[in-house]
């Protein structure tokens, strides 16, 4: 009877509770919870062996417990934000350089702080109150979801921007990259975690439009706080220690920098830098001094976080110092925000002056200094070489000592090259003239290849004189080069000119000079040029020398070569015969004169004249053969002249 009475009493209480609830509120979760409570009680009273809680009821209770925990977390975060906003003095109206947008934003931010303080006191009472209607709840959840999506998009954009800035910092200092990347990753992960917590809190605990508005304002303030925390070491880099005159920084700096300075900084009890910039102190000093009470407590709670922040600040300061000493003028001008050139010159480091004095002591020329400046700029674009010298305290001295060593190596390399050239000149003086020309041409080819890689900054007149001398040296053998090239191309498709002959000289020589030179060497006139081709007899005397020079030519060129020597000899004989017959046809008195002929020739001629009356058949055949040979020689001569004209 007792269990039945208890069950009846329990049913009556449940019916009374359900009937007392308003009809408009249809909360499915509460109905499921009451149903689970009834089932648990009935199972415990009726069946002693049955499980006390079914798995569906357990899931429902877990969900409710999670929601309660999330609500408590969100309330704790709200109270923390409200305490920080109340702790931070609201003196934005005193700053004269702020924009109207930021004034309105901060004024709006102050209103929900009051609302948060009022609502924060009664947050415990409101947690137990039943929420509004289901339509209002759906509207709130949609609004909170859209807010969470917008915040996530903004967070992704902000992280991309931060990664771009971090990449530029890492390009300037790649040396001790591991510590910096670890610190930057830690820095990038903290705002993401905070934003995820805020978005979860928005989606799960939607309590009312008024409370969601206040929470939005507080989350915006927290986002500004995280941005100001992450921009703090970058501002340390942007504002050097020796920079004074904050009035000029307020006038010259962009409005974005002003906004960054005027944003509230909740970084472990730091105060805003607005008052410090108005009173005339640089913002770096105000940021570096931490509030005593709060900072000691926070350091005691989070020692690892503070140590990482201090190391990051020291490392950023060293990187800034090194990059300011090494960066070219345009980069530093952009970093200082459009300052005048005089002020930028005043900020030069003494290490640069010591480097210039060291260069003067070594006796380096200004051209070399200019080349060194270009190389330093290219090294900066690539990023400095990794090494421990940038992380050490004496990083500047180590970096500049390595630069000095490279300059000394360059200087020693130039002296060694000059000594080698002088030894080559001595050896060249002892060689015969033709072999010296061959060596000069090979050296010129090597110099041209080297000149394509590195142009020496010498006197251009010296280069022109050297080029002129090389051209004149090549002209000495230009005519027979042309002859050999023409004959080789005509007779052999695999013709390859010798390596020591320069087609560059033939291209660069004017046509009139080579034409007149060939005329003078052959002793021919312009009229004779039309009748027979140019021929140089000295070339056959110099041919053995060419064969000696190119003794490994067939081995170096695997292309099958025909017997060019035999063909060249045959063509030379034909050319000689043609030359003689043309001359004899044009000048019979010159070739048939008695002075040119020996007494034996005169006796033979007299005998021939005496017996010239009747020709035999053999003599007629010989004459026909000679006539045919003459025709062939004339055709060959026409081909030669045609190839020369073409």
Curated annotation (Swiss-Prot):
Q: Which domain of life is it from?
A: Eukaryota
Bias type Basic and acidic residues, positions: 67-90, 119-128, 137-173, 208-228, 340-361, 406-425, 442-451, 459-472
Query: Where is the stretch described as Disordered?
Result: 67-483, 588-620
Keywords on record: Cleavage on pair of basic residues, Cytoplasmic vesicle, Disulfide bond, Glycoprotein, Membrane, Phosphoprotein, Proteoglycan, Pyrrolidone carboxylic acid, Secreted, Signal, Sulfation
**Which residues are reported to be glycosylated?**
93, 113, 190, 222
* Modification after translation, per record: O-glycosylated by the trisaccharide, GalNAc-Gal-NeuAc, on 2 sites in the N-terminal. May be glycated.
Per the record, residues carrying Phosphoserine are 74, 93, 99-100, 104, 123, 146, 168, 205, 276-277, 295, 351, 354, 375, 378, 502-503, 514, 584, 593, 598
Q: A Gene Ontology CC term for this entry?
A: transport vesicle membrane
Query: Which residues are recorded with the post-translational modification Pyrrolidone carboxylic acid?
Result: 476, 567, 634
Annotated site, Cleavage, chain positions: 161-162, 275-276, 278-279, 324-325, 629-630
* Annotated signal peptide: 1-20
Which ranges are annotated Basic residues under compositional bias? 260-270
Disulfide-bonded cysteines: 36-57
Pfam name, any one = Granin
Residues bearing PTM Phosphotyrosine: 374
Transmembrane feature ranges = none
Polar residues bias (residue ranges): 182-191
Give all Phosphothreonine modified positions: 79, 92
Sulfotyrosine occurs at 315, 441, 535, 591
Q: What does the record give as the function of this protein? A: Secretogranin-1 is a neuroendocrine secretory granule protein, which may be the precursor for other biologically active peptides. The 16 pairs of basic AA distributed throughout its sequence may be used as proteolytic cleavage sites. Secretolytin has antibacterial activity.
What binding partners and quaternary form does the record give? Interacts with ITPR1 in the secretory granules.
**According to its UniProt record, which protein family does this protein belong to?**
Belongs to the chromogranin/secretogranin protein family.
What is the official name of this protein in its record? Answer: Secretogranin-1
Question: What organism does this protein naturally occur in?
Answer: Bos taurus
